[in-house]
Amino acid sequence: MKRLLFLFLLAGILINNHALQHNETIDLKKLAKIVLPPAYQTRVIGGRVTTNAKLGGYLVAMRYFNNFICGGTLIHELIVLTAAHCFEDRAEKEAWSVDGGISRLSEKGIRRQVKRFIKSAQFKMVTMNMDVAVVLLNRPMVGKNIGTLSLCSTALTPGQTMDVSGWGMTNPDDEGPGHMLRTVSVPVIEKRICREAYRESVSISDSMFCASVLGKKDACTYDSGGPLVYEKQVCGIVSFGIGCASRRYPGVYTDVHYVKPFIVKGIKALLSRSR
């Protein structure tokens, strides 16, 4: 936690200097929502209400001590794909549970316990590089309004439009998750533009890409770990951002196609140990 507080202070200094140079004001309360748990999570802004059934049943809600923390994607009846940062300071696997087949957080769907999880050894909160984790459930997630997605098969291209869904905040000033499932379509932003936007605060690595309609459509707090979907494939994992639907900073996602070798290896390791 001390390391995260240091990161918050460092980010505040860097971004505040950037703001002074551009005559801007930085809201440190909103910044804390992005840098410190539980808000290293994101939400859908500018979207529409939907249901898990309409989406295909692949979106799951991940809870820690029964508190909603992150979204996730069911990619196998026993495996969930999510963000590594969701597990930061939340290492007790017995305290994690996963709800499937729900559209409202208050609904009772199909609940499974987390048996194991693997996150990339390259992941560090200070860089957010390789923000990816795979989760093994204690029993298969099957039933009504439950489905799976395949992993992204092709590299992303700028302008490509994808759908992001989740229970995240719908307003940057909110204090908790939204209870209704929402979805929004966002385009992939050119990597050069993405890196330029974040150059004063964080390095955009090869494992990341940006997507949003600046100032209008984005993921936000509590959407973290959820999927960015293209043609029934999960191509992105909601990772982080500065603010939500910011005019300057687009949302940042983990590139599933880039991290696919880690995902495939992790799935094999988890399933081999589950037998």
From Swiss-Prot:
> Which EC number(s) does the record attach to this protein?
3.4.21.-
Q: What Gene3D superfamilies does the record tag this protein with?
A: Trypsin-like serine proteases
Looking up InterPro entries in the UniProt record yields:
Peptidase_S1 (IPR050430), Peptidase_S1_PA (IPR009003), Peptidase_S1_PA_chymotrypsin (IPR043504), Peptidase_S1A (IPR001314), Trypsin_dom (IPR001254), TRYPSIN_HIS (IPR018114)
Q: Which domain of life is it from?
A: Eukaryota
Which cysteines link up through disulfide bonds?
70-86, 194-210, 220-244
- Which tissues show it? Produced in the male accessory glands and secreted into seminal fluid.
Q: Give me the glycosylation sites of this protein.
A: 23
> What span is annotated as the signal peptide, if there is one?
1-19
Which BP terms in the Gene Ontology apply to this protein?
A: negative regulation of female receptivity, post-mating; proteolysis; sexual reproduction; sperm storage; zymogen activation
UniProt xrefs under CDD domains? Tryp_SPc (cd00190)
Give the free-text PTM comment from the record: Undergoes cleavage in the male during mating with a cleaved product detected in the ejaculatory duct and/or bulb of males by 8-10 minutes after the start of mating. Further cleavage occurs in the mated female.
Deletion phenotype: RNAi-mediated knockdown in males results in a number of effects in females mated with these males including impaired processing of the metalloprotease Semp1 and the accessory gland proteins Acp26Aa and Acp36DE, lower levels of egg laying after the first day post-mating, higher rates of sexual receptivity to subsequent males and failure to release stored sperm from the female seminal receptacle.
**Broad class of enzyme this protein falls into:** hydrolase
Where does the record place it?
Answer: Secreted
What positions constitute the catalytic site? Answer: 85 (charge relay system), 131 (charge relay system), 224 (charge relay system)
Task: List the SUPFAM superfamilies.
Answer: Trypsin-like serine proteases
Which key words are in the record?
A: Disulfide bond, Glycoprotein, Hydrolase, Protease, Secreted, Serine protease, Signal, Zymogen
GO CC annotations on file: extracellular space
- The Peptidase S1 domain covers 44-268
GO MF annotations for this entry?
serine hydrolase activity; serine-type endopeptidase activity
Protein's job: Seminal fluid protease which is required for cleavage and probably also activation of the metalloprotease Semp1. Also required for a number of female post-mating responses independent of Semp1 including egg laying and sperm usage.
The UniProt similarity line reads:
Belongs to the peptidase S1 family.
Q: What is this protein called?
A: Seminase
Natural source organism: Drosophila melanogaster (Fruit fly)
